Swiss-Prot record:
It comes from Escherichia coli O81 (strain ED1a). Homodimer. Its EC number is 4.1.1.37. GO terms for biological process: protoporphyrinogen IX biosynthetic process from glutamate. This is Uroporphyrinogen decarboxylase. It is found in: Cytoplasm. Catalyzes the decarboxylation of four acetate groups of uroporphyrinogen-III to yield coproporphyrinogen-III. One of its GO terms (molecular function) is uroporphyrinogen decarboxylase activity. Substrate binds at residues 27-31, 77, 154, 209, 327. The keyword Lyase applies. The gene is hemE.
């Protein structure tokens, strides 16, 4: 495999010395970029874009041509796994993702297959291999999956949800069915992420977007327990290097200590958690990724720089910080504001690594 020219991101995740704080943006390949919109129009629809390795590679690389980012992230979607289980994923205009056959009971769970990542999800592995080839060792490639709980919310609700009443009804009225689904998803995600690593992903991230809607006790039982199982089953060495694992529960700042016990290398933080406080609590165990409010990118450049400086100061001197937004970049952010953000992180962080 090609030697990495910039391994800052991987080093920071392992709390090793770096020259400046590495930075990337969740959803950095996305609708705020006019070139992304053009490629998506060429593909026809979102899933066609995901399933075409050359086009998925193109949109993965687009933000790297604009900004000096320290990592690329595979262009895909967390719902590829439930789609491969046969739930019939489609996208409703203005509604987001929907499934034609939601999971309603234990009998539905029992019928679900565990997808073969090189078969039903082979298009994702083709994209990983294509992106790795085209990156030519410039920066590392991040692979990812949704967490079992987050995937289950879409599968049981039949799509996006605001109140999560359908899955919570299953959780409280038929916990056995939900545990069976989460267990099957944990196995599927472990296979899926390991296949991404074998195909060339140099780090992986588990997105638990909806873990924050749970009580503390339910989070431990229905979300964290299954992410822990995945972390235990992942390939942690490949191609002569450690493969770092980041867990990110949006709205999960109160559970960082428990998350840090899973054996992951890093935790993602959303913008509601104070990074200085997070470092005091778990910084001796894991690296931290985050955590600027994505809406800050609407602010004037001077205000963006001020916020970057504040977060860098909050984390302080030393290793173990990957700068990011606290969630995905919004689709109507001016692309030049993202550029201000990335440049500010590199320039203003140098003093913390001397």
């Amino acid at each position: 495999m090609t030697e990495l020219k910039n391994d800052r991101y991987l080093r920071a995740l392992l709390r090793q010395p770096v020259d400046v704080t590495p930075v990337w943006m969740m959803r950095q390949a996305g609708r705020y970029l006019p070139e992304y919109k053009a490629t998506r129009a060429q593909a026809g629809d979102f899933m066609s874009l995901c399933k075409n390795a050359e086009l998925a590679c193109e949109v993965t690389l687009q933000p790297l041509r604009r900004y000096p980012l320290d990592a690329a992230i595979l262009f895909s979607d967390i719902l590829t796994v439930p789609d491969a289980m046969g739930l019939g994923l489609y996208f409703e205009a203005g509604e987001g993702p929907r499934f034609t056959s939601p999971v309603t009971c234990k009998a539905d769970v029992d019928k679900l297959p565990i997808p073969d990542p090189e078969d039903e999800l082979g298009y994702v592995m083709n994209a990983v291999r294509t992106i790795r080839r085209e990156l030519k060792g410039e920066v590392p490639l991040i692979g990812f999956s949704g967490s079992p709980w987050t995937l289950a919310t879409y599968m049981v609700e039949g799509g996006s949800s605001k109140a999560f009443t359908v899955i919570k009804k299953m959780m409280y009225a038929d916990p056995q069915a939900l545990h069976a689904l989460l267990d099957k998803l944990a196995k599927s995600v472990t296979l899926y992420l390991n296949a991404q690593i074998k195909a060339g992903a140099q780090a992986v991230m588990i997105f638990d977007t909806w873990g924050g809607v749970l009580t503390g006790r339910d989070y431990q039982q229905f979300s964290l327990y299954y992410m822990h199982k995945i972390v235990n089953g992942l390939l942690r060495e490949n191609d002569g290097r450690r493969v770092p694992v980041t867990l990110f529960t949006k709205g999960g700042g109160q559970w960082l200590e428990a998350m840090a016990e899973t054996g992951c290398d890093a935790l993602g933080l959303d913008w509601t958690t104070d990074i200085a406080d997070a470092r005091r609590r778990v910084g001796n165990k894991v690296a931290l990724q985050g955590n600027m409010d994505p809406s800050m990118l609407y602010a004037p450049p001077a205000r963006i720089e001020e916020e970057v400086a504040s977060i860098l100061a909050g984390f302080g001197h030393g290793e173990g910080h990957v700068f990011n937004l606290g969630h995905g970049i919004h689709q109507d952010v001016p692309p030049e504001h993202a550029g201000v953000f990335v440049e500010a992180v590199h320039r203003l962080s140098e003093q913390y690594h001397r």
